[in-house]
């Protein structure tokens, strides 16, 4: 009889400790989240290029002969898989 009582007490102690561990593991629901302050970033204005700089860049990107490159064909041969 004493063994049965000891087992019941041990089981009750184990269940209560498991319940206590589960209760402390969950976050408190009543706590309010901390307010975050939002920092705004001010971007510097970009200076526009002068007309001379634009002309130099345009000269740099022109093709020498004025010919366009031949268009590449993108058709691929596709084989149908065997059924």
Swiss-Prot record:
Q: Name one GO cellular component term.
A: periplasmic space
- Which key words are in the record? Periplasm, Signal
Q: Which residues form the propeptide?
A: 22-56
Q: According to the UniProt entry, which residue ranges have a biased composition of type Low complexity? A: 22-40, 71-83
Composition bias (Basic residues) maps to 57-70
* NCBIfam families assigned: acid_shock_Asr
Q: What is this protein called?
A: Acid shock protein
Give the range the annotation lists for the signal sequence. 1-21
Query: What function does this protein fulfil?
Result: Required for growth and/or survival at acidic conditions.
Q: Please state which protein family the record places this protein in.
A: Belongs to the Asr family.
Q: Subcellular location, in the record's words?
A: Periplasm
Lineage, top-rank taxon, reads Bacteria
Quick one: which gene encodes this?
A: asr
């Amino acid at each position: 009889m004493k063994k049965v009582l000891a087992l019941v007490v041990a089981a009750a102690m184990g269940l209560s400790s498991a319940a206590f561990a589960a209760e402390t593991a969950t976050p408190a629901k009543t706590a309010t989240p901390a307010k975050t302050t939002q920092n705004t970033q001010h971007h510097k204005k970009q200076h526009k290029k002068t007309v001379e700089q634009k002309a130099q860049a345009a000269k740099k990107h022109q093709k020498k002969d004025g010919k366009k490159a031949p268009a590449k064909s993108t058709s691929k041969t596709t084989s149908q898989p065997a059924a």
